[in-house]
Amino acid sequence: MKLTCVLIITVLFLTACQLTTAVTYSRGEHKHRALMSTGTNYRLPKTCRSSGRYCRSPYDCCRRYCRRITDACV
């Protein structure tokens, strides 16, 4: 019983040590990407579509207007 408790505490301690030391930086970036903050916004720059191009929503078009009849940017 005591040996089991000691083993469990040891495993928990080693896991906690690894998590706290995993936030080391290498050239300004995290070594472990899984531990990076997910609160920041990592979006690729979106290009808008010119008039006459196919669109599904107004946000696809540069002028923010998508004609629903023809599904084309205006």
From Swiss-Prot:
Tissue expression from the record: Expressed by the venom duct.
Keyword Signal appears in the UniProt entry: yes
Pfam families tied to this protein: Conotoxin
Annotated disulfide bonds: C48-C62, C55-C66, C61-C73
Stored InterPro entries: Conotoxin
Keyword Metal-binding annotated: no
Keywords: Cleavage on pair of basic residues, Disulfide bond, Knottin, Neurotoxin, Secreted, Signal, Toxin
Major location (coarse): secreted
Assigned GO CC terms: extracellular region
Propeptide: 23-45
Gene Ontology MF terms in the entry: ion channel inhibitor activity; toxin activity
Signal sequence region: 1-22
Compartments where located: Secreted
Domain notes: The presence of a 'disulfide through disulfide knot' structurally defines this protein as a knottin. The cysteine framework is VI/VII (C-C-CC-C-C).
Family, similarity comment: Belongs to the conotoxin O1 superfamily.
This protein's name: Conotoxin MiK41
Source organism of the structure: Conus miles (Soldier cone)
